[in-house]
Amino acid sequence: MEALLAFAAALLALRLAGDLLGRWRARRAPQLAAWSASLLAYAAASAALAWGVAAGWDDHSFRVYYLCGGLLTAPLLGVGSLLLSGRRWAAPLGFLYTGLAVGIALAVPLTAPVTGTSIPEAQEHLHFWPARLVAILGNSLGTLAVVVIALSTIRRRPVGNGLILAGVAVAATGSAVAGLGAAPTAVFIAAAAALLYAGFLFSSGERVSLSPLRRRADRTARRAASGSSAG
């Protein structure tokens, strides 16, 4: 059951990331690309969680989980918020940080093998420098950017910023309860992804009347109706 919940959370985050990517391709708004990358990292972290619970954790699944969930998700959220506020220098900074994070996740040695089905704790497998320190700094600065920009513009975009702040709070709670197991963590991941997605759309002035899944169903129904009429 825990693996199914984690897998479902991964699929949801992946679907929402894909929708944001499609919107970026249509509008070329840079914050949409950064937010899409953040939700994609969130989806990969949830997929690694499902892998670890279903098949047992190993070094590879832990590295993916730590890279995507511990090193990338929050910093990329911050990059998106900075881009939304017009700070274009955030884009190259985001690329530079992503490269650093990937290098750390691939290269740093583990202090102990990763085994079992419970969510591994970083302090049991990674030295403080550089992996854990970079994660702390990246998450702190990324979250700070999101919160400061959301609060400073909340009068202009109350709904969007409120949803983003709620999503950040839910994501932080999910990280805090990781010790309780994969099921509650997966639920928090799914809830945070949905809140963040809605907040991103409201903040960027996108239409949010239909969910991505409902839009797809509507397009399929229209194509089917068109085919029947032609016949």
Which residues fall in each region the model found?
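A cytosolic-side transmembrane-helix exit/cap motif
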Residues: 54-56, 82-88, 112-120, 184, ...
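Alpha-helical transmembrane segments in multipass membrane proteins, preferentially the mid-helix core
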Residues: 15-21, 76-83, 133-157
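Juxtamembrane "helix-exit" motif on the non-cytosolic side of transmembrane helices
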Residues: 49-57, 110-115, 175-180
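Membrane-proximal helix-loop-helix units in multi-pass membrane proteins
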Residues: 75, 85-144
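Short helix-adjacent coil turns
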Residues: 27-31, 154-157
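Individual alpha-helical transmembrane segments in multi-pass integral membrane proteins
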Residues: 1-13, 29-104, 185-194
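Alpha-helical transmembrane segments of multipass membrane proteins
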Residues: 20-21, 46-50, 172-176, 197
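C-terminal transmembrane-bundle signature of multipass membrane proteins
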Residues: 147-231
